């Protein structure tokens, strides 16, 4: 089988690489025009930077103290009958559900303009299966990896950088799926779809996870 092995201490400089890199990207994004940003669509929607930083620090501190992890919560519930982590995730879901209902932003469905989703459920399931499989092998979900990277874990830092790199590959090589949207010219509803390249990439990722695991 596969095992990450025990964590061990290393030099402090390696743990500071990712935080320093993220700080550099923040400075470039706010003080220069070197980095490009979306001017329309979901990628252009974000809170003011100060609010984002404050909210991120608060949520990050809570996630770190509670050891929040989606993969870990399911693992503990199944293997150890411990529902502590799963209770935290369920609580987060309930809070966000109430917030969205109260603000009128709750939408039940997939084929809805403005919602980044599609109704090709087989590939929704396979895509999240690949993510969950990789999270188990890596020792934590993407959120947990981000928290550990902030704590100074160089392994998690490499994982986070890998997620950035993979996101860039998806959007530059036609791997990313499209969400349901309204055609601005005809007014017709255009259903989201999974790209052929994305399907191939998903299958390759699942096969790679099986090879690593066994």
Task: Describe these PLM feature segments.
Residues 1-214:
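Membrane-interfacial helix-loop segments of redox and metal-homeostasis proteins
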């Amino acid at each position: 089988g596969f095992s990450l092995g025990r964590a061990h201490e290393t030099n402090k400089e390696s743990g500071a690489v990712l935080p320093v890199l993220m700080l550099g990207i923040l400075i470039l994004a706010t003080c220069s025009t070197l980095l490009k940003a979306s001017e329309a669509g979901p990628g252009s929607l974000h809170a003011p930077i100060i609010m984002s930083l404050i909210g991120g620090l608060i949520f990050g501190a809570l996630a770190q103290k509670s050891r929040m992890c989606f993969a870990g919560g399911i693992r503990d519930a199944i293997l150890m009958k411990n529902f502590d982590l799963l209770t935290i995730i369920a609580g987060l879901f309930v809070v966000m559900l109430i917030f969205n209902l109260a603000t009128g932003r709750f939408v039940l469905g997939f084929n809805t303009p403005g919602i980044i989703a599609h109704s090709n459920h087989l590939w929704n399931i396979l895509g999240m299966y690949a993510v969950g499989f990789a999270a188990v092998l890596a020792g934590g979900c993407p959120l947990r990896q981000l928290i550990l990277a902030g704590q100074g874990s160089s392994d998690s830092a490499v994982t986070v950088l890998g997620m950035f790199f993979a996101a860039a590959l998806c959007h530059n090589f036609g791997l990313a799926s499209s969400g349901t949207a309204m055609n601005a010219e005809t007014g017709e509803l255009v259903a989201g779809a999974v790209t052929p390249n994305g399907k191939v990439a998903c299958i390759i990722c699942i096969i790679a996870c099986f090879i690593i695991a066994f």
